[in-house]
Amino acid sequence: MPFSIILFSILLPIFAVAAAPLPLMPMPKQIEMGTGTLTLNSEVKIAVHGFGSQRKAFQLARVAQYFERIAGKPIALRVVEGEKADLTIRVKQAETQLSMPQLGMPEDYTLNIDKNGITLLATSVFGAQHGISSILQLATGDPLKPLSFPYTSISDAPRFTWRGLLIDSVRHFMPIATIKRQLDGMAAAKLNVLHWHLTDDQGWRIESKVFPKLTKMASDGLYYRQSEVKEVIEYASLLGIRVVPEFGMPGHASAIAVAYPKLMAKVKSYEMERHWGVFKPLLNIANPEVYVFIDNLLAEMVSLFPDSYLHIGGDEVEPAHWLENSEIQAMMLQHQLKNGHDLQNYFNIRVQKLIAKYQRTMMGWDEIFHPALPKDILVQSWRGHDSLNTVAKAGYAGILSTGFYIDQPQYSSFHYRNDPLPEKPQINLTQPRVMSLAFTVPRLKGSAIEGELVVLGEQVLIKLNSNLHQLVKTDKPITRETLQFIATMDSWMGPLQFEFNRTINSGAIMIGNSRYPLTIASISNPAPVNVSASLSRDNHALILGGEATIWSEMVTEHNLDVRIWPRLFVIAERLWSAQSFTDSDAMYLRLEHISDFSHRVIGLKHKVQQRLGFNSLISTTLGESERIKTLELLTHIAQIVEPSHYYTRHHIKFLQDEYHQIAPLNRFVDYLGVESRQVRELDQLVTRYVAGDVAALVQIEKQLQHWQMKLQDASLLRHSPELTEVHATALKVLQLIELSQHVLEECKGALQPSQTSNLNQQLLALQSLTDEIVITGIYPMRTLYLHCQSVNKH
């Protein structure tokens, strides 16, 4: 008998993932699994009803290509009308000509696979295409077997209507073929918005026939012709993906300054900006010619981009040039404008009216939000849930990007927890204040992070910078007498783990895999505890979804896929699937399959780019056998280490004077995946052992022995000059393995006191904050050591 798995309940989703052998991502809203399998031969009969001719031809070609890649042999699709089909697709709202996807379009579908074939029903062609994506993920095959599909019934629709990816084509230019490949992946992940970042300080990447100097003077010849833009938009629409352009204003405008300096608040000759960061050039918002420029630019761009939303950026405005400009000073007096924020709002109000003239809705980052603007603007939040909630409470729509910045290496489990509408924990603010601490976390670049910790009864809350207080988890109950403890929370920086040591008024914080020092100070006048209030049901409806972002300071076309895939599927699932899906272990199991599927079937290049990148570092003077062995060695090392998380690599580059457009991004670390499966498994084993599973110690030892065996040829790396850094890392991994043997001896009670005294410091000494490559295995082994040391002391 088939059994039903309905993902509306609180308890069932975890069991659903565990029980279901379906490697789907995102997971559907409802699944009913049967007990049989449908097999199809090398000719698949297909009937398609409701697709326009262009979309039908496009999708048939894709399905045939993907089926062949799955099967590993030729598969012929034969379109049938009157006879029985193996695969039937029916759309209720039939398409007569190519439909352009828009916000709020129906994306639901139902899918049934049984002995009679595959039946896909959808309200729109866009929902039908999501159903096709599910069919492809369900299919299995090889050259010696027929295509197979498990008997399954699915009823599916997205949780959020805005599910996007921002691609930054400015800081490093991305060719059209690269953009199209990401669209292929987005369609497979059921994402529906490409947010195309086309202008910034470092360049103007889209052809303007009205203002030709923009690309002539400020693109280095790297820009998209209008014909190419139309090609991308059509390709995206055939995949059910909207294309929302971003034209940054009034800041991030150095490229405009190079081409048209008279439009700037400070009129002078400008050179191309090559560095990364926030810069001062701003449009002169008191100059009428600026609004003529914007109006004419909008008229040209809306003729290219059919979507109803247009993004103006609006972030990181440094007002110095405005406040120094006499025309703007006079305007401030005339309109009673007090500061840079008032000036930006004055500009935004005028620009919003221009955008509305072209039947478009203005969109921008947090900084555009102001109650004087019409309610139909859309705010994209990089500042976090507190900012997004403020927007929604004021009656404005918003989407979340904080926590989805995939240009920053972060763990997929962190992205998976990052819900645009998180459930609010119960916090009792009437509990007595037990303790308050202030702490400071210095960063490698920029101002330090200032924080406060407060203990209210049994609750522990942390406040970071100007954000609201947030409930955190601790490793033990905290009292006034507690001198050492650990606290964990998620933040805009990533997952945080604090180690507080009140005995020495210092500690450390892990931001992802990067360990920063912190100092503790007493606090006589702590900030009032202020937590985020719950949103009303009406406010909930204003949170439209979210967007992942791939800013390209540290990314080129040669490693873009390594950074995006496969983890974008995790964010896609968070935006599509039920909120109750929170089992990260089950997610990682499916992600392994999806990584292979997206490489082998969809054609994403995360595996290819890594292999090519590693190959490029191997000396050409080596013989073929040595080159093969070196590549294998690099592949093994890549499974053990990670790039430093958060913005740590960016800040290291800044310290090295390599934080600019000319700096090469072709080292080993540039081709590393963002997280190590083997280290995650090691961490799980340590967690099991600490929880009482003594058998896990044997598996930990086997894992370490496996690493040691794989690194026995580490000396090969010395023969390739580009791998000097990797050789040093490999030697440190071997040191870790040696120290880990002492940790295991400590856990077995066989380590002498003389050997254990400095083991904690020795483990930590293997890693420096200024290392771009992180030997992440240090930290679970340190956790194991501290646990065993504590047990032995007692």
What are these regions, as identified by a protein language model?
Residues 313-337:
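N-terminal leader/propeptide and maturation segments of large enzyme subunits in energy/redox metabolism
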Residues 24-26, 32-34, 40-42, 82, ...:
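Substrate-binding groove of N-acetylhexosamine-processing glycoside hydrolases
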Residues 49, 168, 196-199, 244-252, ...:
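Generic beta-strand/beta-sheet core signal
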Residues 98-311, 325, 350, 354, ...:
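Feature activates predominantly on carbohydrate-active enzymes
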Residues 435-524:
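Central antiparallel beta-sheet cores of small beta-barrel/beta-sandwich binding domains
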Residues 4-14:
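Bacterial N-terminal signal peptides
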Residues 54-56, 173-175, 201-205, 250-256, ...:
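Flexible loop/turn segments at secondary-structure boundaries
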Residues 19-160, 571-584, 589-602:
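Contiguous, structured surface segment used for ligand recognition
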